[in-house]
Curated annotation (Swiss-Prot):
Disulphide bridges, residue numbers: none
Gene encoding the protein: ndhH
Organism: Mesostigma viride
Protein name as catalogued: NAD(P)H-quinone oxidoreductase subunit H, chloroplastic
The reaction(s) this protein catalyses: a plastoquinone + NADH + (n+1) H(+)(in) = a plastoquinol + NAD(+) + n H(+)(out); a plastoquinone + NADPH + (n+1) H(+)(in) = a plastoquinol + NADP(+) + n H(+)(out)
InterPro entries in UniProt: NADH_Q_OxRdtase_suD (IPR001135), NADH_UbQ_OxRdtase_49kDa_CS (IPR014029), NDH1_su_D/H (IPR022885), NiFe-Hase_large (IPR029014)
GO biological process: photosynthesis, light reaction
Record-stated family: Belongs to the complex I 49 kDa subunit family.
Membrane topology: Peripheral membrane protein
Length: 391
């Protein structure tokens, strides 16, 4: 009888593989088609975001944060202004709070849509990609009307938002909500009971409830394993406590459960938007008290700074000598910032807790013993963006 012994094969997937969702590199050890080991290599998109924050005022740093998770930029802005607001005890007006919630939930829908399309393409279904782009374009049109930018909005400010909603925007947004809910049902009819789809995702990448908690997972990854943990309910930030909605969760813990959680979240987000639009109060859209400014250093007339640096110090207030951790429920999980002030206009320490970085840690555990083709399905179901993983 002929016996063949094969050595394990080590291959490198990425960093420019179409299914890697950015510049992730996986060093995969294979025995035939079976995965023996997998080692993620990070850092290709590292831009020293935390160090930059320590040399900028909060106002100056706002345009940078939209480059972490560049598909859900409202959340990175929200966390950036929430930290100094909590430290300095700045009240956010009711209207601004409602506007923020509407923007955050629109951003969540856009992020989940752009997760769904590529995830289905990874599995082999190309059609949904074109459907999700159609809906996502409408959300970006709403963003452009309100903020002037389709993606990097730079809309949140300490104590409120940059500008009020333009005339007719609320009606346009309500029209979109009415249009979008049946579309989610359409996605479900198209995808959920498809036998090929179910073969690829059911019982693939299983995470138990205990594992999810021990690995520190958050967001849809945690809720798909049977843990009902949503920071919008737990922390009641902004005006989520005044609206009627349910936490979406599943108990199966596989790729199918994570898909169903995100689909359910799109529905709930639309309901939140509809309620917020109908209940939005009048009043100011920013707290003018937040403009308690202590100017930075003034440059002398015609000195080195005036000639070569050529910038005015941006008006800002000092961050008190305290430390604080703030968090929001981003589409991918718990996005948090640990801020340490030093009675200075610059933060002394700015630590980013990005959900993607923590969620991707479990990847080697999930793919071990699976087939090579399942790596794409499992990685897609985790939903990572390398901008926030590498920072």
């Amino acid at each position: 009888m002929l016996q063949t012994k094969t050595d394990p094969m080590v291959i490198s997937m990425g960093p420019h593989h179409p299914s890697m969702h950015g510049v992730l590199r996986l060093i995969v050890t294979l025995d035939g088609e079976n995965v023996i080991d997998c080692e993620p290599v990070l850092g290709y998109l590292h831009r020293a975001m935390e160090k930059i924050a320590e040399n900028r005022t909060i106002v100056q740093y706002l345009p940078y944060v939209t480059r972490w998770d560049y598909l859900a930029t409202m959340f990175t802005e929200a966390i950036t202004v929430n930290a100094p607001e909590k430290l300095a005890n700045i009240e956010v007006p009711k209207r601004a709070s409602y506007i923020r919630v509407i923007m955050l939930e629109l951003s969540r829908i856009a992020s989940h849509l752009l997760w769904l399309g590529p995830f289905m393409a990874d599995i082999g279904a190309q059609t949904p990609f074109f459907y999700i782009l159609r809906e996502r374009e409408m959300i970006y049109d709403l963003f452009e009307a309100a903020t002037g930018m389709r993606m990097m909005h730079n809309y949140f400010r300490i104590g409120g938002v940059a500008s009020d909603l333009p005339y007719g925007w609320v009606d346009k947004c309500l029209d979109f909500s009415d249009y979008f809910l049946p579309k989610v049902d359409e996605y479900e009819r198209l995808i959920t009971n498809n036998p090929i789809f179910l073969k690829r995702v059911r019982d693939v990448g299983f995470i138990s409830r205990e594992e999810a908690i021990n690995w520190g997972l958050s967001g849809p990854m945690l809720r798909a394993s049977g843990v009902q943990w949503d920071l919008r309910k737990v922390d009641n930030y902004e005006c989520y406590g005044e609206l009627d909605w349910n936490v979406q969760w599943q108990s199966d813990g596989d790729c199918l459960a994570r898909y169903l959680v995100r689909l359910g979240e799109m529905r709930e987000s639309t309901k939140i938007i509809q309620q917020a639009l109908k209940a939005i109060p009048g009043g100011p859209y920013e707290n003018l008290e937040a403009r308690r400014l202590s100017k930075g250093r003034k440059s002398e007339w015609n000195n080195f700074e005036y000639q070569f640096v050529g910038k005015k110090p941006s008006p800002t207030f000092k961050i008190p000598k305290q430390e604080h951790y703030v968090r929001v429920e981003a589409p991918k999980g718990e996005l948090g910032v640990f801020l340490m002030g030093d009675d200075n206009v610059f933060p002394w320490r700015w630590k980013i807790r990005s959900p993607g970085f923590i969620n991707v840690q479990i990847l080697p555990e999930l793919v071990r013993g699976m087939k090579l083709a399942d790596i794409m399905t499992i990685l897609g179901s985790i939903d990572i963006i390398m901008g926030e993983v590498d920072r």
